[in-house]
Amino acid sequence: ENFTVTSKLKFIPNPGNKNKGEEAGFIIKGQDYAAIKFVTTKDGCFLRYVNCKNAMKGGKEDVLHEMPLTLIEMEKPYTQKYAVDDIPQPRHATQDIYVRAVVKSAGICNNITSSAQFYYSLDGKKYVKLGQPFAVKEGKWIGAKVGYFNCRSSVSNDAAFLDVDWIKFTK
């Protein structure tokens, strides 16, 4: 199947968890994966394009593109949407980031190959290509999947928010 998937995202890290490795993003995964993700580190917030071959067998994630992001103080009504008693206010967030994957498939029957080219945009109009097309491989039980994730390395249930405004699939 050939299709394009585009989504509008905003990353809202937990201000009490600075430098604790929060991650959230947009992913295509199967036995391997590629993702556009937001990451917090001791050096700030970054947008990264990553891929991982042999992910199901513990493969290493490679960072293919990285750019720093500025966090902007959110307005009060929006901040209150993400209010949690023990998290200091106000919240800060990235600007809106648009992510896109163009998936192309070729072949017939059991001999189909697919690839996904990832892009991002800061305005929803001009998209920047990220790396080379990613070879999409099916998962263990079903085909490859498109989705979102939000996680961090420490064990606590107060991670960042990934605000998904919308997702659109087109032919």
Tell where the protein language model's regions lie, with residue ranges.
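Extracellular glycan-recognition regions
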Residues: 1-171
